[in-house]
From Swiss-Prot:
Full protein name: Flagellar L-ring protein
PROSITE patterns with a match to the protein in the record: PROKAR_LIPOPROTEIN
Major localization class: membrane
Lipid anchor positions (S-diacylglycerol cysteine): 24
Signal peptide: 1-23
Key word Repressor present: no
Origin species: Anaeromyxobacter dehalogenans (strain 2CP-C)
Length: 229
C-alpha cells in the first residue's frame, strides 16, 4: 500500500469519526451535565387526604376527572410551561450629618500671689462629618422554559424542574428553573408565571466567545487584587 493511499484512508477514517460524533447531538461549548435539584418534601403529617367514595367517577390527580376545565399538568412527568418574567428594581440612599462642638473656660486668680491680674484659659474644639451615598440596580429577565413535574407533594402541589439550552454561533445559553406550583395556578394553556412558583431557583448563564470576552483576564484580576488604590 502506497503512502498516499494510507494518508487517504486515514483522512477518510477521521472524517467518518467526526460525522459519527456530530450525528449523536449538538456539540456543547464545554462539558454539560443537566442540573438536578434534590428537593426535600415538606412534612405532611398534619395534612389529611380524602379518598374518593366507591363508584365515584372523580379521581384526584386524573386529568380525565376535570370535567369542566382543560387538561393540565397533575402527575409526575407531565409538562408545564413556565413563563419567566422577573423584574428586580432596588434603590437605596443614605445621608449622614454629624456635628460636635466642645468648649473649655478656666481662670487663674489666686494660685500665685504675685499675679496682679487673673489669667483666663479658654479652649474649644469643633468636629463634623457629612456623608452621602446611594445605590440603584435594575434587572429584567424574560423567557419561556418548559418544565417537567418531578414530584407530586402530599398536599397536591407540584415540584417542577426545567432546562433549556440554546446554542448560537459558538455561544451557549442555559436556562434553568425549579420550584413548587399549585395546580390551580396553571392556566388553560398549561402554563404558569414564574411569580407563582414557590421556592423558585431561576438561573440564566452563558458560555462561549462572548462570555469569555466579557470576563476579566487572570493577570488583570491578580493586579487588581494587589493594587491598593
Amino acid at each position: 500500500m502506497s503512502p498516499l493511499t494510507r494518508i487517504a484512508l486515514a483522512l477518510a477514517a477521521s472524517a467518518a469519526l467526526v460525522l459519527a460524533l456530530t450525528a449523536c447531538g449538538p456539540a456543547h461549548v464545554a462539558g454539560y451535565v443537566p442540573k438536578r435539584r434534590d428537593y426535600a418534601v415538606p412534612d405532611a403529617s398534619g395534612q389529611d387526604t380524602q379518598a374518593a367514595s366507591a363508584g365515584s367517577t372523580w379521581r384526584e390527580g386524573r386529568a380525565a376527572s376535570m370535567l369542566y376545565t382543560d387538561a393540565r399538568a397533575l402527575r409526575e412527568n407531565d409538562l408545564v410551561v413556565v413563563r419567566i418574567e422577573e423584574i428586580a428594581d432596588a434603590k437605596r440612599s443614605a445621608d449622614t450629618d454629624l456635628t460636635r462642638r466642645s468648649e473649655l473656660n478656666a481662670s487663674i486668680e489666686a494660685f500665685l500671689t504675685s499675679l496682679s491680674t487673673p489669667y483666663a484659659l479658654k479652649g474649644g474644639a469643633d468636629s463634623g462629618f457629612k456623608g452621602l451615598g446611594s445605590t440603584a440596580r435594575t434587572e429584567r429577565l424574560t423567557a419561556t422554559v418548559p418544565a417537567v413535574v418531578r414530584k407530586v407533594l402530599p398536599n397536591g402541589n407540584l415540584f417542577i424542574e426545567g432546562h433549556r439550552v440554546v446554542l448560537v454561533n459558538a455561544e451557549e445559553q442555559h436556562f434553568y428553573i425549579s420550584g413548587v406550583v399549585r395546580p390551580i395556578d396553571i392556566d388553560q394553556e398549561n402554563g404558569v408565571k414564574s411569580s407563582m412558583v414557590a421556592d423558585a431557583e431561576i438561573e440564566f448563564t452563558g458560555r462561549g466567545v462572548l462570555s469569555d470576552n466579557q470576563r476579566q483576564g487572570w493577570l488583570s484580576r491578580l493586579l487588581g487584587w494587589f493594587w491598593p488604590f
